[in-house]
């Protein structure tokens, strides 16, 4: 089958575009201080090797090596590591350091100087995107310090405003001229193509002028200026069977020349070219304008010091079942996390990298509290309403397990109190220095729908997002309504200013093979993927610019280098 027809199968539906856009890319620089000295007559000759961990199999694979720097315990490596960055993924990294003793590329032939484990989010989320960590791995020895800095690559935050027109396109309609539109594809590493933009249809003309459109350089070519961009020209048909007119290829570098004779493209239909000797083309497409704009990115705010505050709220209603019974969604299995624990850990372990103090408020709702059995929809899991903060995700898990032993599951399922709890904090910080993420884990049918909608509409004006994970077998129709992807949430005639709710049913992520690590990585990816855009939509709407990052660390330079 002609590969062209495969690639156009989805041209009618471009709603999933955002999922296909690659992450931004960051450049990680490595410096070390006070490395171990393994050489007898001189100082060590260090090299740093980066390993990345696979999500499913947890295997470490070598990603790259710096150069060797001769005779120093304080190297500032020149060669950088360029990594794809996804906010919604936990990207585990390992930096191994060696003292190079020969030209051999085999690392076992060199002296091990120690290693550091971290996540890419940890580096990016540190103040000024600069992380210092002790080097470990040699018992009883002080191995020195590693300094890791992350810098977003400039090409990843550029967007392009482009406009095209066409001349003398083939006539495809029996009773009139064509109704042309353009479809843009970026090429992938494996030679396949991914759709990245579709223009509007211009009706009944062979010489259309399309409206200017804006697209990020990441979406257009993944930041690679020489990567092929394929453009297909179609004649629109009401029944969706659009007629192929022809195609051409270009690249970002060619387009960046702007309007010129280099940017007039012949539209060619390969089938016609193969059959007809006199065939030249099916018309031409001309670039009318090309303007590059640099956009402020999520990482600009993080680097400037914006903190993400994470709060969890857990459903303690009786519909979860008696926690002492294995059938309960709150059952404490000594060998395996329950669904609540898995959801907390999956999302929390990623978000915690962006919160400097790692102290998280943890709330519960729908339970009777000791000693008097009053019903609460906003209680502290640690039992301290004045200070509901828990130390790290592990602290949240401990408080959750402790409270299961002391409270009585009851009802009803009310969300509004915990949403309003976080909104009170968010409403006091509107300068862009903090953003709040509330994770609600629930088993069910919501009881206070009207109040919850009102809370969401009010919260949509504040620096906050809400993630809802539904556990158990219930129907979650009401949650889908709160998600607001299809219809914006409204209350009393007022619509939410922006979409701030993301809902996912936990059952969609239960891995039949029992690989919980992989299924939880997928859960975290899906619930967190929208956060950076929700964050930016708040900052843009309020006209808040990122704070300047602290001045970059500039260590003293060393000149001697050897390649390995």
From Swiss-Prot:
GO terms for biological process: cellular response to calcium ion. Ca(2+) 4 binds at residues 173, 179, 235, 237. Ca(2+) 1 binds at residues 39, 45, 99, 101. One of its GO terms (molecular function) is metal ion binding. Residues 1-133, 142-265 form the C2 domain. Binds 3 Ca(2+) ions per C2 domain. One of its GO terms (cellular component) is plasma membrane. Its cofactor is Ca(2+). The keyword Repeat applies. Gene3D superfamilies: C2 domain. CDD domains: C2A_Copine (cd04048), C2B_Copine (cd04047), vWA_copine_like (cd01459). Residues 309-510 form the VWFA domain. The modification Phosphoserine is found at residue 260. Ca(2+) 5 binds at residues 173, 235, 237, 243. Ca(2+) 2 binds at residues 39, 99, 101, 111. InterPro entries: C2_dom, C2_domain_sf, C2B_Copine, Copine, Copine_C, VWF_A, vWFA_dom_sf. Ca(2+) 3 binds at residues 101, 104, 109, 111. Keywords: Calcium, Metal-binding, Phosphoprotein, Repeat. The keyword Metal-binding applies. Belongs to the copine family. Probable calcium-dependent phospholipid-binding protein that may play a role in calcium-mediated intracellular processes. This is Copine-8. It comes from Homo sapiens (Human).
């Amino acid at each position: 089958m002609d590969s062209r027809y495969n690639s156009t199968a989805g041209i009618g539906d471009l709603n999933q575009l955002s999922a296909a856009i690659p992450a931004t890319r960051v450049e990680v620089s490595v410096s070390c201080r006070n490395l171990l000295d393994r050489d007898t007559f001189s100082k060590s000759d260090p090299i740093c090797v980066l390993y990345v961990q696979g999500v499913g199999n947890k295997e470490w694979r070598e990603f790259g090596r710096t150069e060797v720097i001769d005779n120093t315990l304080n190297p500032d490596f020149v060669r950088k590591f360029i990594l794809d960055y996804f906010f919604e993924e936990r990207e585990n990294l390992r930096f191994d350091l060696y003292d190079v003793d020969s030209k051999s590329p085999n690392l076992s032939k060199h002296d091990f100087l120690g290693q550091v484990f971290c996540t890419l989010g940890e580096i990016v989320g540190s103040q000024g995107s600069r992380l210092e960590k002790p080097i470990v791995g040699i018992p009883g020895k002080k191995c020195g310090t590693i300094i890791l800095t992350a810098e977003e690559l400039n090409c990843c935050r550029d967007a392009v405003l482009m406009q095209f027109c066409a001349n003398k396109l083939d006539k495809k309609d029996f009773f009139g001229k064509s109704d042309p539109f353009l479809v843009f594809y970026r090429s992938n590493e494996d030679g396949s193509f991914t759709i990245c933009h579709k223009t509007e249809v211009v009706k009944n003309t062979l010489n259309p002028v399309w409206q200017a459109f804006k697209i990020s350089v990441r979406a257009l070519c993944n930041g690679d200026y020489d990567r092929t961009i394929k453009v297909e020209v179609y004649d629109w048909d009401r029944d969706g069977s659009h007629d192929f007119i022809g195609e051409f290829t270009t690249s970002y570098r060619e387009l960046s020349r702007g309007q010129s004779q280099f940017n007039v493209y012949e539209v060619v239909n390969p089938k016609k070219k193969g059959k007809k000797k006199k065939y030249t083309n099916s018309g031409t497409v001309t670039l009318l304008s090309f303007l590059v704009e640099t956009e402020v990115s999520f990482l600009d705010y993080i680097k400037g010091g914006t903190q993400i505050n994470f709060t969890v709220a857990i459903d303690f209603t009786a519909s979860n079942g008696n926690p002492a019974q294995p059938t309960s969604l709150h059952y404490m299995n000594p060998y395996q996390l329950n669904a609540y624990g898995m959801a907390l850990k999956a999302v929390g372990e990623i978000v915690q990298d962006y919160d400097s103090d790692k102290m998280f408020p943890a709330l519960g709702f729908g339970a009777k509290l000791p000693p008097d059995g009053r019903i609460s929809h906003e209680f502290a899991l640690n039992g301290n309403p004045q200070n509901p903060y828990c130390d790290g995700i592990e602290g949240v898990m401990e408080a959750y397990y402790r409270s299961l032993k002391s409270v009585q599951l009851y009802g009803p399922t009310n969300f509004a109190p915990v949403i309003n709890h976080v909104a009170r904090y968010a409403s006091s910080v509107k300068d862009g220095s903090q953003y709040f993420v509330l994770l609600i884990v629930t088993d069910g049918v919501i009881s206070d729908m009207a109040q919850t909608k009102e809370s969401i509409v009010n919260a949509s004006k504040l620096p906050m997002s809400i993630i809802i994970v539904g556990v158990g077998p219930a129907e979650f129709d009401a949650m889908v309504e709160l998600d607001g992807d299809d219809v914006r949430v409204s209350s009393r005639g007022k619509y939410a200013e922006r979409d701030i709710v993301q809902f996912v049913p936990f059952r969609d992520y239960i891995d039949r093979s029992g690989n919980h690590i992989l299924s939880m990585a997928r859960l975290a990816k899906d619930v967190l993927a929208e956060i950076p855009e929700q964050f930016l939509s708040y900052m843009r709407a309020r006209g808040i610019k990122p704070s300047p990052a602290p001045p970059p660390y500039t260590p003293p330079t060393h000149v001697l280098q050897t390649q390995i």
